[in-house]
Curated annotation (Swiss-Prot):
This is 3-dehydroquinate synthase. SUPFAM superfamilies: Dehydroquinate synthase-like (SSF56796). Pfam families: DHQ_synthase, DHQS_C. The keyword Transmembrane helix does not apply. Zn(2+) binds at residues 184, 246, 263. GO terms for biological process: amino acid biosynthetic process; aromatic amino acid family biosynthetic process; chorismate biosynthetic process. It is found in: Cytoplasm. GO terms for cellular component: cytoplasm. It comes from Streptococcus pneumoniae serotype 19F (strain G54). Its cofactor is Co(2+); Zn(2+); NAD(+). Catalyzes the conversion of 3-deoxy-D-arabino-heptulosonate 7-phosphate (DAHP) to dehydroquinate (DHQ). The keyword Lyase applies. NAD(+) binds at residues 71-76, 105-109, 129-130, 142, 151. It is an enzyme of class 4 (lyase).
Length: 355
């Protein structure tokens, strides 16, 4: 299956196909002329797939080097970026060469940021290996790294030349790593896709059910992401809907310490908390919080953060990238399959942190 991201200045395709990683070289050869390529990955993904992808690219005529770093959200920072820059220089990469981001969201965000800033920008592609990356972070051109102040505080908008998604690689994920990706999938059903929500309702929540329906779940999610990215590439309007649950979710990630709470887990807890208060305020329909809670719990996602400290979470919220002056653009779901922007003051945002 191919999904076209038809952005006028930089259109590209998402290819979703079981087993397609084995043809990575052929796929990339259709996008780029033979040239130097650096695969950026983490040590865990490298042990599983780096050699396989490297050989496929070399068979297609590319000169390939591999840079890997220790896995984990806590490594998504400017220190790691500097190390990648140094490696690219040593490999002699020029503006006519490219980067292959092979890994989950941390790898994709960091490698995309490096590609968009090295020599003012070189080509890159995404080969995502986690469910979160396959349904969300590899698509749409947001890149970034964390700072001690906030998640993804330093970043760019830079579209890849293509995204290659192999659902079979999800079979090598640990249970927690697979399940956390369902936080984003559930979000897509809530904000835009009632058909996806119905599909999720029919699943029993097991790892086996996720893997069995992975290709369909990924396709639905990518279609929602495609629509919002094409209409609003730079995140000024409809694309903000994708941030449902993320305002509080990012604050949870930051206060917990990067890597302690996984992104999809934080999104799940954020969606439940936002919905609970919005429902109490009459801004979301009665019963929707219970529906979201039950859906998250069915797939094994957490719905409550045990280290809830309002002051720390509020401090993290003040660094939210969606803030404009003293106003936050909060995303709510007034009905299943529909989202809206609800501007709130930073002061009012404290209401949404009350347990």
């Amino acid at each position: 299956m191919k999904i076209r991201i038809d952005i006028p200045h930089h259109p590209y395709d998402i290819q979703i196909e079981k087993g397609c990683m084995a043809q990575a070289g052929q796929w990339l050869r259709e996008l780029w002329q033979p040239q130097k390529v650096v695969i950026v990955t983490d040590n865990h993904v490298a042990s599983l797939y780096a050699e396989k992808v490297k050989l496929s690219l070399e068979d297609a005529g590319f000169q390939v080097a591999v840079f890997d770093f220790l896995e984990g959200e806590e490594r998504k920072n400017l220190t790691t970026v500097q190390k990648v820059y140094e490696f690219l220089v040593k490999q002699g990469l020029t503006r006519s060469d490219g980067i292959v981001a092979l890994g989950g969201g941390v790898v994709g965000d960091l490698a995309g940021f490096v590609a968009s800033t090295y020599m003012r920008g070189i080509h890159f592609v995404q080969i995502p290996t986690s469910l979160t990356a396959q349904v969300d972070s590899s698509i749409g051109g947001k890149t970034g790294v964390n700072t001690p102040f906030a998640k993804n505080m330093v970043g760019t908008f830079a579209q890849p030349d293509g995204v290659l998604i192999d659902p079979l690689v999800l079979e090598t994920l640990g249970k927690r790593e697979l399940i956390e990706g369902m936080g984003e999938v559930i979000k897509y059903g809530l904000i835009e896709d009632p058909e996806l929500w119905a599909l999720l309702t029919g699943l029993n929540g097991s790892v086996e059910s996720i893997l069995e329906h992975a290709e369909t779940l990924i396709x639905h999610s990518c279609q929602v992401k495609r629509k919002m990215v094409v209409e609003d590439e730079l995140d000024n309007g409809i694309r903000l809907y994708l941030n449902f649950g993320h305002t509080i979710g990012h604050a949870i990630e930051a206060t917990a310490g990067y890597g302690k709470v996984m992104h999809g887990e934080a999104v799940a807890m954020g969606m439940v908390q936002i919905s609970k208060i919005a429902e109490e305020k009459g801004l979301m329909p009665a019963g929707i919080t219970q529906s979201i809670t039950e859906m998250c719990q069915k797939f094994g996602l957490p719905v409550d953060y045990e280290n809830w400290e309002v002051d720390k979470l509020y401090q993290a919220l003040t660094h939210d990238k969606k803030a404009r002056g003293n106003t936050l653009k909060l995303v709510l779901v007034p009905e299943l399959g529909s989202a809206t922007i609800h501007p709130v003051s930073l002061e009012e945002m404290k209401d949404y942190l009350v347990k």
